[in-house]
Structures are given as C-alpha cells and as structure tokens.
C-alpha cells in the first residue's frame, strides 16, 4: 500500500485531513482522541463524557466519520462515556492495513478495538445507517460483550434496499456536487430539505461538502454491502435492542420494517420517528436523544 493510502495522493491526504480537522473543531463538547492499534489497522476514536460513565460506542453511517454524531453528542455524553469511532474502512482518520472483505472482518475489527480500549463486557453499541447494520452484525457475532444494542435507520438489516438505490448510488458517485446533492442527499434527507430555513440549508451544504471531500480524496475501495438479517438471526438476539426509523425512511418502508420485527422478533423494541426519514438524528434530534437515553437508562446498574 502506498504511504498515502487510503487517499489518492499525498496532496489528497493533506487536503482531506485539513478539512476533517477544521470540521472537528465544531464538536460541541470536550473530547480527547486516540489512535488505537488493532490487527486490522489504526482506528481513530473521539471520546467524550465522564470518565466513570458506562461505555457507549457510536458507529457512523457510510461515507461519513465520527463527526456525523455532532447533533447528538452533547446529550449522549452527559451521562455516558461516549466513543465515537471513525470506521476503519471509510472516511475519517482510521486506516486499515489488512483487507476488509466481509461483515466478519468488520465485527472482528470492532472486537479488537473494544479490547484495546478496555471496554469490558457491558458495552452499549449504537450505529446509524451502515453503522446500524454493523451494530446488528456485532450483536449477532459477539453478544456477550454487549449490554444494549441500538439500530438507528440501519441500512438493509430488516428490509432489502429499494430498486432505485443502485442507480442513485451510481449517479452520486460522479464527482460533482450536483449529482451527490440531487440524487442522494436530497432524496435521503428530504425532511431536512423541506425545512428550507437558514440552518437547514447550511447543514445540507455541509453534508454535501463532507461527502464530496471524501469522494474526491479517497481511492476506491470495494464496499461492504449491508445484508438483511434472516428470521432466525433476528430471533436469536437476546440482549436488549432498540430499532428506530423515521416514518419517511427512503431505504425501506418504515411500517413494514416495524411489522416484520414485531412479528418475527417482538423482543426487539421498535419506534417510528414522526416527520423524519434517514435524517432522523438531524431533524428530530431531541426526540431521538430522548428515546435513546430512556432506553439506555432503563435498568441501568448505576440508576
């Protein structure tokens, strides 16, 4: 691998990391960072919250980094020791040194990371979109390490991607703002777009900036495609699990996803977030935070 991997060049690496560090200055609470060695490479972790708080690990969506949690981190880190992770096989400051081929590699990487961070066997794990799917996979593979599992609008996991996902993904990979914004972000984040106020417009532009910076600076890596869990897999989950989805979710019909879980795996708690889609953590931040914290604090040993 070249010295500048996973970037396209030394210049691209410098450009992206400068942009990333500038965006990171907007993190709204005190944090410290660690670059953690694992058998799959170096993982960058942003840590916030009380040092004696129960561990809460956050996994980002695809084509994003730990910074995707900026809207929610203030509330989450008030009581929990929050570890916001840069996916080792996506954008951010993490760098894989071993090939990542499938979900097992991803969950083994996470297990290495949790051991290196000395998080013990009572971890709260939460993921958004791709991170939600990865959370479900870790829940299946390493349930004894988890206390609670939270899936926020998980990609696939419950329902297959819609047919339009493929062509939207192809068009949004064209390195121009118009295609990324028009065919992917404005579609996924339609509720944010509809707000059309100054802060929402600014946030949408930042999301486009983030995506384009990664697209322009990173070399192509074969993506890991999220899968749909089988009935048996969903039924096998015994630890306390929460599934949150926006009523206007574009990746799958929210009501049908909830119906499947309620029928096949009623032990998984489900909630539909009103007036939100895949942007639920952005347009309904307070409601999502409230539901997540209520779920986490229920039967918390520190309560």
Give the predicted meaning of each segment:
Residues 1-56, 79-80, 297-303:
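Alpha/beta-hydrolase fold catalytic core
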Residues 41-92:
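Conserved HGGG/HGGXW glycine-rich cap/lid loop of the alpha/beta-hydrolase fold
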Residues 84-126, 290:
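Active-site loop/oxyanion-hole signature of alpha/beta-hydrolase fold enzymes
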Residues 140, 148-176:
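Flexible "cap/lid" loop of the alpha/beta hydrolase fold
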Residues 157-162, 178-235:
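Conserved alpha/beta-hydrolase catalytic His-Asp/Glu region
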Residues 237, 243-245:
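Short beta-strand/loop motif that positions the catalytic acidic residue
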Residues 248-252:
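Acidic catalytic loop of the alpha/beta-hydrolase fold
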Residues 276-285, 289:
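Catalytic histidine-centered segment of alpha/beta-hydrolase-like enzymes
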């Amino acid at each position: 691998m070249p010295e500048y991997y996973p970037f396209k060049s030394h210049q691209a690496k410098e450009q992206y990391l400068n942009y990333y560090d500038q965006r990171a200055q907007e993190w709204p609470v005190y944090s410290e960072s660690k670059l953690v060695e694992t058998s799959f490479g170096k993982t960058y972790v942003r840590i916030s919250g009380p040092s004696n708080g129960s561990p809460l690990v956050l996994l980002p969506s695809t084509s994003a980094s730990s910074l995707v949690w900026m809207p929610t981190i203030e509330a989450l880190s008030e009581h929990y020791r929050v570890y916001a992770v840069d996916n080792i096989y996506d954008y951010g400051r993490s760098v894989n040194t071993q090939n990542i081929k499938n979900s097992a590699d991803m969950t083994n990487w996470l297990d290495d990371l949790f051991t290196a961070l000395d998080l013990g066997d009572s971890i709260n794990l939460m993921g958004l979109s791709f991170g939600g799917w990865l959370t479900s996979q870790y829940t299946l593979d390493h349930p004894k390490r988890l206390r609670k599992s939270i899936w926020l609008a998980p990609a696939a996991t419950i329902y297959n991607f819609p047919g339009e996902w493929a062509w939207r993904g192809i068009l949004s990979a064209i390195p121009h703002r118009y295609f990324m914004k028009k065919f992917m972000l404005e579609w996924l984040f339609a509720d944010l777009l509809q707000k059309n106020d100054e802060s929402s417009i600014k946030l949408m532009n930042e999301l486009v900036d983030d995506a384009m910076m990664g697209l322009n600076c990173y070399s192509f890596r074969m993506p890991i495609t999220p899968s749909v869990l089988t009935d048996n897999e969903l039924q096998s989950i015994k630890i306390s699990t929460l599934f949150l989805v926006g009523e206007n979710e574009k990746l799958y019909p929210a009501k049908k996803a909830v119906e499947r879980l309620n029928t096949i795996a009623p032990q998984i708690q489900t909630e539909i977030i009103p007036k939100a889609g895949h942007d639920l953590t952005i347009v309904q931040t307070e409601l999502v935070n409230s539901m997540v914290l209520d779920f986490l604090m229920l039967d918390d040993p520190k309560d």
